């Protein structure tokens, strides 16, 4: 009579052991999976610390409070994978403060070859005598790209190595044919590499789609300005999952040389997305009369050239205020020097609302952005008010123009990072050493690598499952 009961107890005990082993294995699998996601990366954040004092834009980073604020090391990646002129800046150092009425953001990055003297093409277009590097872009086509001149296009002309030839230029890469617009100009280097002169947005889209875009061409005398930008997300989808921009035409639905472009270059990929962008440009907004050609000719004090009804107060450095959404990229002023203006009237002073100061020393750019926390009501549709208690999603980009980065060819954060105004003092951080061929500096650094929000959600779900598994194990073995 006891044997069946003993067998039943044995089976019950074995069932417990089996269930326990399965749950334990599941628990370990979850832990191993979570181990592959560094916990320091699950909540990327830029704290903006409360300080007493103002920005010193004449000497960025020199204000006494900066020495108490830790650097945050933000990883950057190539905007165009595999392009040799994309992703040249691997990390960006950032720290931020607020003083009750202004937010001040300090950036620093390694730049072995500063783009001194290069015009911003948009600024150069306002000044007819402009000369020197940066007046327009030149594209290096993918090695192996060839060309022919199709003579049956009798109304077309092409320019090859300075010679005007009747016929239409057709590019060929691995059997993919791309007929070029009328009056297309190319230079063929001695090694067969093709350099395309000028680059309207639609052309860049077509070249990129057909695998012919290799990068922007530079040499010792032709290059582009350096840039740094901060994107402030203002869209309806929270949190945003993408900070990328479309490559496309100049306006939505643009018809160019027989091709219609649905997307506009610079418009946001994120559905429901919108953002304000602060763009510093060494060849237009630096306020350095020696190396910034726009300030050298006093461009921003000349309303007859800029088309603006106001001038740059005190001729200080600034960041171009941009606004982008799913439709287009815009400029938050009335002239539309870089992009289409958001409106044709009002917005007095908006182009120079964000102040900047910049220095280049020992192989590093240091750029300081300063902006009032509150914006005028006329700006509020395109610029965020920044307040305590709110989380902001920001992204960063850097261009090294001397090395070929310009326009959509840049180094970017792979996702948005959170930014908040805080009232607590900075936390202690590990001291790290930044080394390069030209400078060695010891500074406090917190490393932040942006990861997709989906990874964060998976991590949280995994932790919850692990806790539930432990509870089940406890209940099973307690019985």
Swiss-Prot record:
Membrane-topology annotation of the record: Multi-pass membrane protein
Keyword Transport: yes
CDD domains documented for this protein: DOMON_b558_566
Alphabetical UniProt keywords: Cell membrane, Electron transport, Glycoprotein, Heme, Iron, Membrane, Metal-binding, Transmembrane, Transmembrane helix, Transport
Cellular-component GO terms for this entry: plasma membrane
UniProt xrefs under Pfam families: EB_dh
UniProt-annotated location(s): Cell membrane
Chain positions carrying an annotated carbohydrate: 73, 99, 152, 172, 182, 191, 219, 262, 288, 302, 325, 348, 385
An MF annotation (GO) of this entry: heme binding
Stored InterPro entries: Cyt-c552/DMSO_Rdtase_haem-bd, Cyt_b558/566_suA
GO biological process, one term: electron transport chain
Functional description taken from the UniProt entry: Monoheme cytochrome whose physiological function is not yet clear.
Cited NCBIfam families: sulfolob_CbsA (TIGR03154)
Protein name: Cytochrome b558/566 subunit A
């Amino acid at each position: 009579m006891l044997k069946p009961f003993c067998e039943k107890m044995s089976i019950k005990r074995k069932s417990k052991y089996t269930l326990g082993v399965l749950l334990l294995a599941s628990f370990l699998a979850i832990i191993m999976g979570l181990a592959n996601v560094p916990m320091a990366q699950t909540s990327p954040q830029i704290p903006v610390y409360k300080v007493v004092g103002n920005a010193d834009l004449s000497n960025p980073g020199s204000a006494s409070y900066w020495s108490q604020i830790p650097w945050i090391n933000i990883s950057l990646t190539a905007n165009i994978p595999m392009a040799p002129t994309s992703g040249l800046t691997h990390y960006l150092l950032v720290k931020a403060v607020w003083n009750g009425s202004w937010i001040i953001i300090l950036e620093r990055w390694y730049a072995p070859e500063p783009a001194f003297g290069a015009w911003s093409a948009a600024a150069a277009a306002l000044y007819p005598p402009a000369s020197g590097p940066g007046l327009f872009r030149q594209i290096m086509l993918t090695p192996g790209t060839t060309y022919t001149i199709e003579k049956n296009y009798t109304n077309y002309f092409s320019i090859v190595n300075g010679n005007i030839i009747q016929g239409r230029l057709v590019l060929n890469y691995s059997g993919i044919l791309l007929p070029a617009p009328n009056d297309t100009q190319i230079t063929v280097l001695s090694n067969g590499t093709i350099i395309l002169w000028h680059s309207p947005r639609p052309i860049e889209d077509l070249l990129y789609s057909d695998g012919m875009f290799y990068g922007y061409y530079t040499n010792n005398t032709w290059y582009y300005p350096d840039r740094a930008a901060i994107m402030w997300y203002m869209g309806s989808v929270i949190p945003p999952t993408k900070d990328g921009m479309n490559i496309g035409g100049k306006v939505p639905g643009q018809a160019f040389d027989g091709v219609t472009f649905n997307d506009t270059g610079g418009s946001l990929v994120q559905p429901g997305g919108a953002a304000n962008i602060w763009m510093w440009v060494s060849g237009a907004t630096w306020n350095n009369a020696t190396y910034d050609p726009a300030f050298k000719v006093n461009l921003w004090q000349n309303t007859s050239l800029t088309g603006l009804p106001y001038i740059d107060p005190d001729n200080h450095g600034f960041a171009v205020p941009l606004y982008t959404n799913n439709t287009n990229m815009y400029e938050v002023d009335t002239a539309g020097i870089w992009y289409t203006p958001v409106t044709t009237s009002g917005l007095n002073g908006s182009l120079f609302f964000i102040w900047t100061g910049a220095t280049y020393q020992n192989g590093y750019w240091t750029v300081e952005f300063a902006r009032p926390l509150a914006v005028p009501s006329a700006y509020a549709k395109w610029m965020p008010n920044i307040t305590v208690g709110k989380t902001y999603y920001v992204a960063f980009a850097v261009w090294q123009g001397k090395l070929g980065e310009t326009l959509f060819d840049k180094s970017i954060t792979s996702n948005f990072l959170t930014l908040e105004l805080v009232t607590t003092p900075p936390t202690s951080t590990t001291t790290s050493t930044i080394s390069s061929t030209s400078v060695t500096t010891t500074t406090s650094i917190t490393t932040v690598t942006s990861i997709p929000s989906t990874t964060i959600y998976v991590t949280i779900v995994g932790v919850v499952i692990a806790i539930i598994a432990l509870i089940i194990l406890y209940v099973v073995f307690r019985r």
